[in-house]
């Protein structure tokens, strides 16, 4: 029986509230306090450039046209300011809410907006492009930069119909350059542009990649499923590599949901972390802040009140392992299992159901078969969906705890990135995947920074809900699980294997000479 190709991750990139994804910059921002000093300086430098705080001037650096004598000193002295312009924070009124609908009427002032001063559309001719599409261009370019191999080399090795692209949004592109502009124009006394409708479509991210970056004529598409969208696209990519239909697949999502209309929608269903309830919770928890502390607006698995929206665009390049060997691509991990299931009959479309129990259990069973029970129990972790709502903290923790108990996992490390990034809707699973690749490299799982302890109604007998970074050596963790509980019953989970496990699997299939001849993975430096 012929073995299926192994879908391996050969590049990644994108951007979200924590920074750009390549070189693990955004991930490192979420584990900043656990980094070595040199890595902290590297992150600060990258963020300062993104924000336009510093610029290269020949062989030196400048701020506001004045030369910086010692860049490291400058970065260290301004560390708090630089990082305060990233991750979940107070919304920028001028950019997101000039009419005061969010800040003055709804009064929900927190958002996981892109780093202050960063404009993804400034790097190319982006006139009238919806924000998520600008983020797509930046994010996919970032991915190709991380890849380190010219795309023309892929085109020489692979026929055009063996390349595929799956990317898009869940909500649609609803800012004023997309569907938002089309819906608002007559009300505001103007008319829709010829681009509003097209640029608002949910699959337009893939179209932009095909038309403006890769020139792709192969398969294209997008599997939208609320918060599980990225994992749905990942499942598509994995399956067509395994069945031989495609050899290279771009998997991604892009979403820019920080608009007054979307905030209003989540506010209406009581899912949003608004200022009034934020202050009330801070008082209940005896925290010192009297005004809304936007930094802690999203509190997954703790005492919480609701979610925060965030912007993100994330992409990976999947390919079969033989092609990766042939071109000498770096391998960051592999995707053996992605499961998606609906909830079946239920009384409320927004309520939880059985689907997520099935998806996660399937992925954990797969890991148990591949890694064995001991490694599963001691060297894996999970990125929970962790929206920050009271309903999620009980329903998802029950799922995680039940599955952990069933497989003999005593204290399963649980992270929830939305405390840092907000909820990027379609891209939530992509944020998790990018962070996972960072954990392979640095050995650190991000904590849930906004909580002091799990809420009393959280099911955590078999869970280790991380209130501190979990620090191990690089590649200590052999596998990670990504989880998404999407609105309406769109549930998906994924098993991601680390690079050393992936390489071990590849080595069993291929000759030692083929393995030696290819630069597959550069091991990260061990921690002290």
Q: Predicted regions: what is each one?
A:
Residues 153-164, 219-225, 249-254, 330-339, ...:
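Beta-strand segments within the central parallel beta-sheet cores of soluble alpha/beta enzyme folds
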Residues 1, 47, 92-134, 172-236, ...:
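Conserved catalytic cysteine-centered active-site region
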Residues 357-381, 386-389, 396-402, 406-409:
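A glycine- and small/hydrophobic-rich beta-loop-beta segment
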Residues 1-151, 167-182, 201-219:
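A glycine- and small-residue-enriched flexible loop/hinge segment at structural boundaries
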Residues 136-149, 202, 206, 221-255, ...:
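Active-site-proximal alpha-helical scaffold in enzymes
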Residues 245-305, 338-352, 386-393, 410-463:
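Acyl-CoA/ACP chain-elongation machinery
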Residues 5-13, 17, 29, 277-373, ...:
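Condensing-enzyme catalytic core mediating Claisen C-C bond formation in acyl metabolism
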Residues 1-9, 154-160, 372-377, 407-409, ...:
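Flexible, low-complexity linker/loop segments at domain and module junctions
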């Amino acid at each position: 029986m012929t073995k299926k190709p192994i879908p391996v991750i050969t590049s990644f990139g994108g951007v979200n509230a924590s920074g750009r994804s390549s070189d693990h910059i955004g991930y490192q921002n979420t584990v900043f306090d656990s980094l070595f000093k040199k890595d902290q300086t590297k992150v600060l430098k990258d963020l300062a450039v993104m924000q336009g705080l510093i610029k290269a001037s020949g062989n030196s650096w400048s701020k506001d046209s004045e030369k910086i004598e010692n860049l490291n000193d400058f970065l260290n002295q301004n560390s708090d300011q630089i990082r305060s312009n990233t991750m979940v924070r107070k919304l920028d009124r001028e950019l997101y809410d000039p009419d005061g609908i969010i800040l003055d009427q709804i009064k929900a002032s927190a958002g996981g907006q892109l780093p202050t001063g960063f404009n993804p559309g400034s790097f190319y001719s982006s006139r009238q492009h919806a924000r998520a599409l600008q983020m797509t261009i930046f994010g996919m370019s970032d991915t190709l930069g991380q890849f380190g191999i010219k795309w023309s080399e892929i085109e020489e090795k692979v026929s055009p119909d063996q390349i595929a692209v799956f990317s898009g949004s869940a909500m649609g592109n609803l800012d004023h350059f997309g569907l938002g502009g089309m819906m608002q124009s007559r009300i505001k006394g103007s008319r829709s542009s010829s681009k509003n409708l097209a640029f608002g479509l949910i699959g337009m991210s893939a179209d932009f990649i095909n038309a403006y970056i890769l020139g792709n004529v192969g398969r294209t598409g997008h599997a939208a499923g609320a918060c599980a969208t990225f994992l749905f696209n990942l499942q598509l990519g994995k399956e067509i590599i395994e069945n031989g239909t495609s050899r290279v697949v771009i998997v991604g999502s892009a979403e820019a949901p920080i608009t007054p209309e979307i905030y209003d929608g989540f506010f209406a269903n009581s899912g949003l972390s608004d200022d009034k309830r934020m202050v009330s919770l801070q008082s209940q928890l005896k925290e010192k802040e009297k005004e809304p502390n936007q930094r802690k607006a999203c509190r997954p698995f703790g005492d919480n009140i609701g979610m925060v929206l965030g912007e993100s665009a994330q992409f990976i390049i999947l390919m079969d392992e033989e092609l990766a060997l042939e071109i000498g691509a770096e391998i960051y991990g592999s995707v053996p299992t992605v499961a998606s299931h609906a909830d079946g009959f239920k009384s409320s479309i927004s309520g939880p159901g059985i689907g997520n129990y099935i998806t996660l259990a399937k992925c954990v069973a797969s890991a148990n078969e591949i890694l064995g029970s001991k490694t599963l129990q001691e060297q894996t972790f999970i990125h929970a969906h962790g929206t920050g709502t009271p309903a999620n903290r009980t329903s998802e923790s029950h799922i995680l705890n039940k599955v952990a108990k069933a497989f003999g996992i005593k204290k399963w490390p649980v992270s929830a990135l939305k405390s840092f990034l907000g909820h990027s809707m379609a891209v939530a699973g992509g944020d998790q995947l990018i962070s996972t690749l960072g954990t392979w490299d640095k050995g650190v799982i991000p904590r849930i920074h906004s909580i002091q302890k799990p809420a009393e109604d959280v099911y955590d007998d078999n869970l280790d809900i991380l209130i501190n970074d979990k620090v191990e050596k690089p590649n200590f963790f052999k596998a990670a699980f990504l989880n998404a509980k999407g609105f309406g019953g769109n549930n998906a989970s994924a098993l991601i294997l680390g690079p050393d496990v992936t390489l071990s699997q590849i080595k069993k299939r291929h000759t030692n000479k083929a393995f030696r001849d290819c630069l597959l993975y550069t091991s990260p430096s061990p921690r002290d």
